[in-house]
Every structure is written in C-alpha cells, then in structure tokens.
Amino acid sequence: SNLILARGDTFLYFYPYWDAAAEALRHGRIPLWNPHLFMGAPFLANSQAGFFYPLNWPVWLLLPTPYAVSASILLHLLIAGVGAYLAGRQTLGLGRWGGLVTAVLFALGGYLTAQVEHINQLQGLAWLPWFLWVAARVFRSRLGNRWVLVGQGAVGFALLFSLQLLAGHTQTSFITGVMLIVWGAAHGLEKWLLRDSPHGLGLSFQWRRFYRRLPLVLLMGGGVAVLLTAVQLLPTFELIQQSSRQGGLTPNEVLSF
C-alpha cells in the first residue's frame, strides 16, 4: 500500500516470520518447519520468531501483521515506561516527577527506540527495569519471613526471565544478568563508603541480608525460567549445534560485528 513505515529487519525479516506464525496459530498448528526459505529451514527453533512469547498471540490473532508489529511496539514501550517508573521510585527513591522522567528517558530514549527495528530485542528489553523493581522490593524489605521474600523474588525473576527468553533474544537475558551484578556491586560500594556513617549498623545488616538472598533468588528464579521456557530453548539449542557458528567467532569477527 506504500503506507507502511518499515525498513531493514522489520520489513525483510520480522514481517514474514510474524505473518507465518500468525497463520499457523490461527490454524492451531505449531510451525516446526519453514518451507518457504531456500530448501526449507527450522521455524520454531529460530527463537527470534517468538512463537511462544505470550504477548505475541493476542496481536497475531486480532490484527494483520503490520498492525500487529505496531501494536506490539507501542505495548512494550508502555511496559518499559511503567517498569522504569516503578524501578525509579522503588530503587532510587525518586518522587513521582522523578519517576516520570525516568520512564520517559528509558522508554523513549535512543537505545530502546532504536530497537523497534528488532522487535524481539525491544520486547525483551522492555522487562529489564522490572527486574530492578522486584530486586528492590525483595532485598530492601525489612518485613516478612526471609524464605517468603526469597520465594517472591524467585517467582518474579522466573517470570521475567521467562518472558525475556521467549521473546527470542537470549542476549537480553545476559545483559539483564550483567545489570543485576552491577547493581549489586553498586550496593556494595555504597555500603562500604557509608560504613562509618551513623546508620552503619543498619546498612551493614541490609548488606548481609542482600547477599544472603541474591544467590538464592537468582538460582531459583533462573532454574524455574529454564524449565518454563524449555519448549523454546531445547529446539533452539538443537539448531545451534548445526550452526556454522557453533564453535564461536574469532576475536576479529566479534569486533568487526
């Protein structure tokens, strides 16, 4: 119609995959194989198609592919903004206006909006600030049973990691893990710098509580997420074994990419 604003991977990669996935879903079929690419290629095992990502199904069933992509972009920018707002309020102790500025900067900033061409990356990154919100609620809480808080954190991390993995961009989960490590290290630096402050004992207690809970939450949440997403991870892992890049890339190839 010449009315669709799309370029690069959106138009050439995701539109065809989403259209094929939507057609399969409407016919109650799991698309294991793609017969339209070369002499055929695995479809489900290509995690970037995001067939099992739960927020893809409604837009696939209700909207034509171009509108489905647009709706998903808007939805996940909203999810990212709400998550950034809550994370800013809970993690940094910001007020309403500070949280709003955080939401706008994250959801409409250059990095996230640049990923609208890579819908699976946008979908995964939209959940990133929600990890900070869950972590802050669990690790900073002084109330409640320790194991209840650990369980709540593990459930939250499991659901969020599952959504990221099913969105189809595994690197986003890696980025999230690095973020949580940096966040923990920043907490450690904060506690060390304030060790002689009048609130030192309280900070020391929070510091010990933080490191008692963090490994448990990450291990439990990550383990449950792997089980929940095995329906996607196992076919993808099998496909990786057949890849020409299965042995990894040379440093020169990594840097040039």
Q: Over which residues does each language-model region extend?
A:
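Membrane-interfacial, low-structure loops and terminal tails that flank and connect transmembrane helices
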Residues: 142-149, 190-215
